[in-house]
């Protein structure tokens, strides 16, 4: 087995795996992954994020739903790297989110670390737990379920 730390993906590689684009691409780099097991990556949160203009003026805080979306995107990369399915033909859609907890606000300048671990996979459904950290402290956590579907079925 290869060293998980050798499984690094830069932004160009991530763009080849996810359909998301600015301003909705929320994973900047993958620092390690093991297909079928887990993934770690991060999002550099900057004041240039468009959502900070309205959330909240004078006290910018990253919306919790976007933290969840960042975790879901990291999880989507894990799913892609865990299958042989051509990514161009597929979409990964949230089907459920459980046990969501927001523990710490995320501010401009934070490096949002994204950790997802696969819990189970059956047919088109993938269930994983996700944890978001800032400076080693838990900012948010959730259990997420996603379905893999054909683009043409949408």
Curated annotation (Swiss-Prot):
Cellular component GO terms, alphabetical: cytoplasm; membrane
Subcellular location: Cytoplasm
Membrane found in the keyword field: no
Recorded GO MF terms: (3R)-hydroxyacyl-[acyl-carrier-protein] dehydratase activity
Alphabetical UniProt keywords: Cytoplasm, Lipid A biosynthesis, Lipid biosynthesis, Lipid metabolism, Lyase
Record's function text: Involved in unsaturated fatty acids biosynthesis. Catalyzes the dehydration of short chain beta-hydroxyacyl-ACPs and long chain saturated and unsaturated beta-hydroxyacyl-ACPs.
Protein known as: 3-hydroxyacyl-[acyl-carrier-protein] dehydratase FabZ
Species assigned in the record: Nitratidesulfovibrio vulgaris (strain DSM 19637 / Miyazaki F) (Desulfovibrio vulgaris)
Lineage: Bacteria, Pseudomonadati, Thermodesulfobacteriota, Desulfovibrionia, Desulfovibrionales
UniProt gene name: fabZ
